[in-house]
Amino acid sequence: MKINRLKKYYLQTIVPKLIEQFAYKNQMQVPRLEKIVINRGIGDASQNAKVLESSLKELTIIAGQKGIITRSKKAIAGFKLRQNLPVGVCVTLRGERMYSFLDRLINLALPRIRDFRGMSVESFDGQGNYSLGVEEQLMFPEIVYDKIEQITGMDISIVTSSKTNDEAHALLKEFGMPFKAKGNKN
């Protein structure tokens, strides 16, 4: 079985660096990636099934794994939403697909964003997980501009086993995530 380039880099390079940096006594204490969740909410999904289908297809192409359709849990009259109507699509990546997606995100997709200055350090949630929002799916090289129905963004949550934001920041920085400098707010 072929091991992913990023996973190999994690095992051979990142783990020893983090053991030294945080003075872990055991290799199992080193934080690791648990899963990556890609979520896309679609407001028109209840009225237009074609938008939902194309969005699910795009997310499947981006993630390399078939997504699921998320449905509303309760009715909200202000949004013209009934219970159990489709409202979005979601994919949870683990294992090799997770490392493959993170590799493509860091090395191919993020550099293609116009006026990209780095990822915000404030997007950690306090338990060592990182979330980022993407404004358009065109940053992924797998998506062909002529075949998209509608330009929509998505939320990407990177779940780690770390207990603090500092550990998760060090882990993602070692993976190559381009963070802004701490003092830089732009």
Curated annotation (Swiss-Prot):
Alphabetically ordered keywords of this record: Chloroplast, Plastid, Ribonucleoprotein, Ribosomal protein, RNA-binding, rRNA-binding
GO cellular component, as recorded: chloroplast; ribonucleoprotein complex; ribosome
SUPFAM superfamilies: RL5-like
Disulfide-linked positions: none
PROSITE patterns with a match to the protein in the record: RIBOSOMAL_L5
Molecular-function GO term, any one: rRNA binding
Membrane spanning stretches: none
GO biological process: translation
UniProt cross-references to InterPro entries, sorted A to Z: Ribosomal_uL5, Ribosomal_uL5_bac-type, Ribosomal_uL5_C, Ribosomal_uL5_CS, Ribosomal_uL5_dom_sf, Ribosomal_uL5_N
Chief localization: plastid
Record Pfam families: Ribosomal_L5 (PF00281), Ribosomal_L5_C (PF00673)
Subcellular location: Plastid, Chloroplast
Stated role: Binds 5S rRNA, forms part of the central protuberance of the 50S subunit.
Summary of subunit composition and partner proteins: Part of the 50S ribosomal subunit; contacts the 5S rRNA.
Family listed: Belongs to the universal ribosomal protein uL5 family.
Protein name: Large ribosomal subunit protein uL5c
Organism, as annotated: Pleurastrum terricola (Filamentous green alga)
The encoding gene: rpl5
